Amino acid sequence: MMRIWLTTLLAWGVLNASSITAPLLDVQNSRATIIAENVREGMSGVIVRTFDATHSTIIANAHVEQFNPSNGRAILKLSKYDSLRQNSLPGGNWLVQPSDVAVLASDYGRALLIAPNDETYDTITKSISGIEWIHPDNYATYLSYKGHPTPLKEDFNRYCTANSIGLLYVHSADTLFTLDCKSFTLLQTAPSLKKEQKSSSPFYSRIPTIRAAWWGEGSSRLDSYEPYYLELIALNNSKNKELYELYKAKFSEKSALLRYFEIKE
């Protein structure tokens, strides 16, 4: 059985993160400020308003745009709450204010794993505790409905939002990448100890075929598992210096993947 080097990572960090709650200190336009510990840039969450001892509601989405670990100060980017959509019911028209509370990593107990084969999938899901794993069969069914045999970033975002999934794990190039599924920001990486021998496209699932739309982005079938996910992660984390150095060390300084980064040497 494949062994994954996760021992030290399972005990701390975002892999088993509990919700982080902090009051808003300041709100200016579409941004708010909090003071909190164990925060990572890219973490997503919600803004909650409490009306009384028994009544509260979510009024906005939020994700960490900047974080200063020296003083714990985080700047949140605010956006419309879109996890529950029901056009037939009235919705609130509240503006976020300093008396509200930010709840980050609220969905980090649920995760989706993109793996190349069943052996890798079973090993990782059994190695990481405290996570409710959403089976990739469900995601493959969603992609078939959309007609996208090649999953797009927007497909991950919408599926995770609709199903309250906070973390996306992607195993590629002998590395386990942990991303916030809603912001697609890389949170953590862990190396594996064994090279993959086989891979399914677009990922391991028990769904034999994902329906393809006639045309449009995502309608083409994925030819190769590994390059696609490495590129997708790089494109959406182009300013991540640690990811840039990881790619450079793993694939050489002439790798085509490095062109996706906005990093100055």
Give the role of each language-model region.
Residues 4-13:
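Sec-dependent N-terminal signal peptides
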Residues 17-265:
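Surface-exposed, polar/charged interaction patches used for macromolecular assembly or partner binding
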